[in-house]
């Protein structure tokens, strides 16, 4: 008799950086024969349809995102709104609770995978189904910022509290700087959807779900996973690296032709995801740093705060000075294919979990320039613990970087004969070989599937 199969619902936070990894996991679980109902904002569905590799088993369920005063009309995901308005988007998602419950009731699902919707475990319990908080944020970050060891101190956490690891945390090398601790302290208490604080939303999600899930490996984050399992007293399901399937379409000709004009390993690719918006001075310092390296570069960036377009934010005579060797592009690109291109030798990343995964699967050297939240601890883990990248130096108090610090990090990572470059290159090569082992992924998905069976009894 074959292994049991289940009807799984997916309802990730309305951000492409969450929707996409949930779909990658859905593809892996569909291979095991599970039926997936994937709830997704209506207009966003077409963006993900090309990545649905099992349309016979994975069905998209459209969700009309309720309008909330203050949101742009038609806004569906975080890429449609500036960062300060994400709290209103969370409010809109919270207002789908009744619709979601009705959908689950009609579909007769067995288990739901979710994140950020702290009401989901209660909905699941009412319907007699299980809930898994499948968290895109790394276990290292959750353990550092959201564990019961933090929450149960009986008062609001200060900057000083957050600059010290929580009791029992397994890694003393991860430390926050002053400006980072200040930002984390503010983020914990900010309202994120109605009157619910960000830290409370996450803590309730982890405390009341039946299991936690993460896209990681024990070989990389095992101690952090053990810490969370003991802190929350519930199972942790690890899906492994969840390597995206190779894209079916080739790299767009405009980029294939441009990258093809440079020697192997010589181009810097710089991208900060669909949400990161830099301040004007930091945007221009970043571009200055790219120019100072003397290397060809492709920078994919959003317009900085206060600018309507990337073009109007460029320094005077910038385009003339980098003509033929530098491009600043506003808009979506095929990042996975760009990172795979032989000309790309360095990736300056904001350290979002999806971008880091794609980077580790490829050969380019990593330069780490985190912006907010979990990106900071991701960068610290990559640079201090795993030593697979070089982090850009920032001011201790103000958190600002300079063009010179960007250039210095690139040179440290790229220069021939540099001990730092050799160390991160060797460590990255070992990590890449480990992650691309097909037996590794299949064993993790098998174990994930087994733990899911145990959970559903």
Swiss-Prot record:
It catalyses: cyanidin 3-O-beta-D-galactoside + UDP-alpha-D-xylose = cyanidin 3-O-[beta-D-xylosyl-(1->2)-beta-D-galactoside] + UDP + H(+). GO terms for molecular function: UDP-glucosyltransferase activity; UDP-xylosyltransferase activity. Its EC number is 2.4.2.50. Pfam families: UDPGT. Keywords: Flavonoid biosynthesis, Glycosyltransferase, Transferase. Xylosyltransferase involved in anthocyanin biosynthesis by catalyzing the xylosylation of cyanidin 3-O-galactoside to form cyanidin 3-O-[2-O-(-xylosyl)-galactoside]. Required for the accumulation of anthocyanin in red-fleshed kiwifruit varieties. This is Cyanidin 3-O-galactoside 2''-O-xylosyltransferase FGGT1. The gene is F3GGT1.
